[in-house]
């Protein structure tokens, strides 16, 4: 059984979706705005949040931001008719599993909720935008959300997130090789790291796996899934 939080001021939509989920054996709470949702999140540990973006009192982007402070492990998905909304970009930086443009088919929502992984946030540090996008898409396909950084400086600007692991290219702009990894480790002590490198030399830093470009994405995802299963058990040398 899983617990979901649905936040939408369209009560009929929320009730219909909740009924389908409950029929499948899951627990569902409904809120009509972000403030109501946060009150529920303070009392209950949810596996995933599904929220509209534009609602009275508190919208979806602010809700995701505040939820990360209360329960950073909950997966978060957004439904919106305004995919170019500036506030949506802020929410993306805090690790969304999906952004679903309205109208969205209910089966698509159900599939995403079923796949969503609690404590499933991955930090991706890669300056090649195409590779970063491909990695994030592949991670989402396995139920993982991602936050990204393309430079050493950007690793310092990640939102109030708690990734369970990181995929890190050792050579990104803004510092010497390995600086981005060191900054991540300073911010997230003990964070398991999989190194993605363009050289065939074993990285001279503590890591839980390394992949040389070009690599087999399926093998990389298997390594991420292993770390997710073992989260909380892995002891990482500092």
Curated annotation (Swiss-Prot):
Signal peptide: none annotated. The modification 4-aspartylphosphate is found at residues 52, 169. Is diphosphorylated by GchK. SMART domains: REC. Member of the two-component regulatory system GcHK/Anae109_2439. Is involved in a signal transduction system responding to oxygen availability. GO terms for biological process: phosphorelay signal transduction system. It comes from the Bacteria. PANTHER family: RESPONSE REGULATORY DOMAIN-CONTAINING PROTEIN, STRESS RESPONSE REGULATOR PROTEIN 1. Pfam families: Response_reg. Residues 3-117, 121-228 form the Response regulatory domain. Keywords: Phosphoprotein, Repeat, Two-component regulatory system. This is Response regulator receiver protein Anae109_2439.
């Amino acid at each position: 059984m899983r617990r979901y939080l649905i936040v939408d001021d369209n009560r009929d939509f929320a009730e219909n979706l909740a009924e389908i989920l409950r029929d499948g054996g899951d627990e569902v709470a409904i809120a009509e705005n972000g403030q109501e949702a946060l009150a529920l999140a303070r009392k209950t540990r949810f596996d995933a949040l599904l929220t509209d973006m534009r609602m009275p009192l508190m919208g979806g982007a602010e809700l995701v931001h505040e939820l990360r402070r209360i329960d950073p492990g909950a997966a978060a998905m957004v439904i919106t008719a305004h995919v170019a909304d500036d506030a949506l970009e802020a929410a993306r930086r805090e690790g969304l599993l999906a952004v679903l443009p309205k109208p969205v088919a209910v089966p698509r929502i159900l599939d995403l909720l079923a796949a969503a992984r609690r404590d499933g946030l991955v930090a991706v540090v890669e300056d090649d935008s195409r590779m970063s996008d491909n990695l994030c898409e592949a991670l989402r396909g396995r139920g993982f959300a991602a936050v990204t950084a393309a430079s050493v400086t950007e690793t310092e600007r990640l939102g109030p997130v708690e990734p369970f692991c990181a995929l890190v290219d050792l050579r990104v702009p803004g510092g010497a090789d390995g600086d981005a990894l060191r900054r991540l480790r300073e911010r997230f002590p003990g964070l398991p790291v999989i190194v993605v490198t363009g050289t065939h030399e074993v990285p001279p830093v503590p890591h839980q796996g390394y992949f040389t470009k070009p690599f087999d994405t399926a093998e990389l995802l298997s390594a991420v899934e292993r770390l997710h299963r073992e989260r909380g058990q892995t002891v990482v040398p500092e």
